[in-house]
């Protein structure tokens, strides 16, 4: 019985084996193809990375795979806390994954592009296709006379890049040393033809000199720190300040300014006439009312040591000879002759200082005139901006003051201000200390300062008549409560800073002065204390 049962079991097992083999044969091609795909995908993978820690074949990772399951079959990297919180990527965007490189490259190209240059190129290329009437002067003939009508230039809006550059240059004017300011704003160099070493001397034009201390005016794009162009006599001999009446013509050929003259001209602009007159009297040993070259050098050194420009000059550490103070500068040649044996009177020197201030004011006026309308007049808003140029008033309050002038002078009230009226008012400001005393006495007497009183004080104190229109603009600019009366305390403070052109300000951020003050207070407390510090 047992033998028979054994024989019966064997066929059953053989039949099951045959069934399993048949099933495996039918499914063998599919498994073989899947295995081949896995093998092909794992060919380029390191042998140690083909399998997981549990011996399973490592599946190919998909960077865009996403699942919300925290655990379970098919979940990988479940031990990582970052994997659960990774950002979800919208499936249509996953197909655009490779376009990210193109977007990054396009963004870098946009950031490095010079749109101003591109705009100028497009404008110059499209110029022949524009109507001639909008670009050229309109010529109208009436009664045999030809009249030219010029289009008013539009004010160019400053972009983000220009505003950042202007802010940097304003900080440079305030806190840098004179030699660095000169190196940044000077644009000309003259190479010495007698030397093969390529040594050169750097010069400023009158426009460069004005730009070096005028805030808000950007240096030309091509020129910057230690970037100069070669001097061309044919080009610069027709300079508009090369006429004999200009003070810059007296400084040398074609009105060029070297570093020594730059330092002393900045000192002239930041020092009053009374200080120079007193210095002349002190160093006039002979008592003849004039100074020789040696005595004038002492006056020059004394005045420069009292100004922020002279105090910040670092002549002892300047490596280039072009930025050292020379003894035979163009100023000394003009004052004492080529041999240096002449004499300089205080009257001649004060006249030179007044002429310098006149030429600087003329350049400032012509720059405003070119922005408004080149007809010899500037509008009231530009005149107000000219007065507030070095006012050191916060931007919000300054905009409020200028807006008051714009509202008052528009339409029929917009008459314009000539250079003669501007010059007369600035000559009135040269006596601002005497004007302050006179206005203070009138206020103590209970008199309100209106337009008529200001004109009367100008004539009595300075002998300079002021036009009604200019006085109206000034009162509107400083009339905070809109009652038609002048707030003379603020006006006097602003005008004093305006006449010094911001050159009296300390050329540092105040941090070192704070440390010096703390150290000085500590020393005084140490010496004044009766108790020992131990």
Curated annotation (Swiss-Prot):
SUPFAM superfamilies documented for this protein: EF-hand
Keyword Ligase assigned: no
Entry protein name: Calcium uptake protein 1 homolog, mitochondrial
Source organism, top-level taxon: Eukaryota
Tagged with keyword Metal-binding: yes
Gene Ontology molecular function: any one: calcium ion binding
Annotated region (Disordered), positions in chain: 131-150
Residue ranges constituting the EF-hand domain according to the UniProt record: 271-306, 338-359, 466-501
InterPro entries assigned to the protein according to its UniProt record, in alphabetical order: EF-hand-dom_pair (IPR011992), EF_Hand_1_Ca_BS (IPR018247), EF_hand_dom (IPR002048), MICU1/2/3 (IPR039800)
Alphabetic keyword roster: Calcium, Calcium transport, Ion transport, Membrane, Metal-binding, Mitochondrion, Mitochondrion inner membrane, Repeat, Transit peptide, Transport
